[in-house]
Amino acid sequence: MVLGREAGSGTRGAFEELLDVADQCAYAQELDSTGGVLAKVASTPGSIGYVSLDVVDDTVKALSLDGVEPTEENIVAGSYKLSRPFVMATLGTIDEQNDLVKTWFGFVQSDAGKAVITAMGLILPQ
């Protein structure tokens, strides 16, 4: 059973774009959350779906691609090809932003901010 996110989901859009299969997937079921996909895969033998690495737990098995495991090290090195970066964007440079935006960027780059990112299971900005 092939499971996916609903049309319009950013996760679905990125997955289909990375694999160049936009509008070609026939899902047996479309779910409205990453947690829903994870839970359905975990409870349905023979199913497959896609989720973000940060939500993978011991209820499912993350698949290797071309023998490469989906680990932080492999993603950062570029050897695990099914990944996408996120960026934070502003209009202009950080120095041109208001104090709240400057504080946010400072926090993300601080040890405390990095600890939060790591605790969430996300990969630190490089």
Predicted regions and their residues:
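Exported/periplasmic ABC-transporter solute-binding proteins
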Residues: 1-126
